[in-house]
From Swiss-Prot:
Source taxonomy: Eukaryota, Metazoa, Chordata, Craniata, Vertebrata
Role summary: Probable oxidoreductase that may play a role as regulator of mitochondrial function.
InterPro entries named among the record's database cross-references: Amino_oxidase, FAD/NAD-bd_sf
Subunit structure of this chain's protein: Interacts with COX5B; this interaction may contribute to localize PYROXD2 to the inner face of the inner mitochondrial membrane.
Name the UniProt record assigns to this protein: Pyridine nucleotide-disulfide oxidoreductase domain-containing protein 2
Positions of FAD binding: 38-71
Family (UniProt): Belongs to the carotenoid/retinoid oxidoreductase family.
Compartments, record wording: Mitochondrion matrix
Amino acid sequence: MTICGRGLRRAVGASPRPTWRRALSDTRGRLKPEYDAVVVGAGHNGLVAAAYLQRFGVNTAVFERRHVIGGAAVTEEIVPGFKFSRASYLLSLLRPQIYSELELKKHGLRLHLRNPYSFTPMLEEGTGGKVPRSLLLGTDMVENQKQIAQFSKKDAQAFPKYEAFMDRLALAIDPLLDSAPVDLEAFQRGSLLQRLKSLSTLKPLWQAGCILGAQLPQYYQVLTAPAAKVLDQWFESEPLKATLATDAVIGAMTNPYIPGSGYVLLHHVMGSLEGVRGAWGYVQGGMGALSDAIASSATAHGVSIFTEKTVAKVQVSSGGRVQGVVLQDGSEVRSKVVLSNASPQITFLKLTPQEWLPEEFVARIAQLDTKSPVTKINVAVNRLPDFLAAPNTPGDQPLPHHQCSIHLNCEDTLLVHQAFEDTLDGLPSKRPLIELCIPSSLDPTLAPPGCHVVSLFTQYTPYTLAGGKAWDEQQRNTYADRVFDCIEAYAPGFKGSVVGRDILTPPDLERVFGLPGGNIFHCAMSLDQLYFARPVPLHSSYCSPLRGLYLCGSGAHPGGGVMGAAGRNAAHVVFRDLRSM
């Protein structure tokens, strides 16, 4: 398209320099030999931890391996003129305290809330000249019921009750997200005083129990049962169940029929944006703009952030206490504490001298489940996708469904199950599960006029292909072509609109973003790796066996997603420990 070409030329190089980088180069750009605290990795959790520590009066520096901050919450211009949220792509789970306490709106964060938020087109022949059916869900419950009634009037009546049921569970779990887990080590091995102090960590559990009350057994089932079993108890129509089940498997090497998948379902419905519970939205300028806002808040209070500065090793004193880090260029930076936003595996198996860690602890970290089904494909297109189930208007302007998470190959939970089964044999799914998002439908700054960016979160793809083969360029392109063929069936003309793409298989996600196995949560969000077992039992309160070394990333409680809770909670624990030194 001509209009797209003109806009593309204007867009190249038009991105302004982030506020945090301007402030840092003006006042705090020189590396000092010593800080109170060092944060390894400028992912969103690391930036949050640094921002809080600096506010507490702890002089903090952040070292980032890449040329850009944000970790997986990053905006990158892979195709000239098109700005992609290259890894994470939606916002909802960010804790409201972080939004307000770090004054992120003041530091440039702008959000586009999505309503409606979910669109599931059917792959079927329209009858009587009508278009194929689809399921469109948003915040209007009456309209939701009308949509669901196309498939089941019984389900339409049950849906508000289901939403209320899940909202109550999310409300109960809320206090657990904003505090360290129960300190089992203090209970088991601490002094009497430490045991008494650790009793305070039981308060969030008590609060959760009070909210759930007599319905606790039903809610326990949600956390432990297969998501399909939970959904079958509420609904009968497959399009609705399959749409809801996508939240149970997103980013997880599981399927709706595996026990424990119900928890991941909850993990993705317990967020809020600007006071609207369960809302999801796009960040103006892409997810990197969120990281820039956190960094701006941090540097405004004195945090120093250094990009392209890889931490090679955690330094330990002869007395067995952290005393700083060594950078890849050989520079030594001393500090009282080190917080790692890297995964538990990188932190404890690569950066930390093994002689300072108990063998049992190292073995547990090495055994963490990091399997990932995800291949993320970022696509630049020169026109809006045109779905058979919801045709575009003549002006080609975005319609309500274009702002949604668009669920493809999602008419039936058995399709999700079959996609999972394929990958057990080392094969990418024949009919992959696809979540398609078009953030430029609400944020035109992401692409040249007339063009759009499309995010494809797809599964299931194995880390290693059948026969022990590694992914190569041909395999990547073959899989991406398969995904595009699937989209073409729902939206003819999609393949012809593509002007560029960026394919990230599980090994690519690991290489680029440091996600072990390509796992977006650092390690699986299964019940055996949650709360006081995250990352491992007895070391779930952000502390490690090595004094002065802390975990503050998604591998710590409460887990993955762009939440920031691990960074905030870890900062409070570190500040408490520093005061007692």
